């Protein structure tokens, strides 16, 4: 049992994905238009989106660099636009 726990902890760290990065993109119900980035677990990239300003989640970053650092993504030429 302890072996399995250690295995999964090491596997999670080796993939470098923070649990917050697996959360879905949430635009929120408010009507502000803040450019933000989120980690898209399907494309395995940080992508740009427009955040409404309220009721978001932790998968919401001010910059592409912050998203890539927190979510363990290597830089790519340019972010995908949504």
Swiss-Prot record:
Top-level taxon: Eukaryota
Described function: Dual-function toxin that inhibits both the serine protease trypsin (Kd=30 nM) and voltage-gated potassium channels Kv1.2/KCNA2 (IC(50)=2800 nM).
Signal peptide stretch: 1-16
Keyword terms: Disulfide bond, Ion channel impairing toxin, Nematocyst, Potassium channel impairing toxin, Protease inhibitor, Secreted, Serine protease inhibitor, Signal, Toxin, Voltage-gated potassium channel impairing toxin
Pfam families in UniProt: Kunitz_BPTI (PF00014)
Organism: Anemonia viridis (Snakelocks anemone)
One GO MF term: potassium channel regulator activity
Cystine connections: 21-71, 30-54, 46-67
Every BPTI/Kunitz inhibitor domain range: 21-71
UniProt KW Manganese keyword: no
Propeptide residues according to the Swiss-Prot or TrEMBL record: 76-82
SMART domains in the record: KU
A cellular component annotation (GO) from this entry: nematocyst
Name of the molecule in the record: U-actitoxin-Avd3h
Family classification: Belongs to the venom Kunitz-type family. Sea anemone type 2 potassium channel toxin subfamily.
Subcellular location: Secreted; Nematocyst
Site (Reactive bond for trypsin): 31-32
């Amino acid at each position: 049992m302890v072996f399995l726990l250690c295995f999964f902890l090491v596997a999670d760290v080796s993939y470098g994905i923070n649990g917050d990065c697996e959360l879905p993109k949430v635009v929120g119900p408010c009507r502000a238009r803040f450019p933000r980035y989120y980690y898209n677990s399907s494309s395995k990239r940080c992508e740009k989106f427009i955040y409404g300003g309220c009721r978001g989640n932790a998968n919401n970053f001010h910059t592409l660099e912050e998203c890539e650092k927190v979510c363990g993504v290597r830089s790519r030429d340019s972010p995908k636009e949504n």
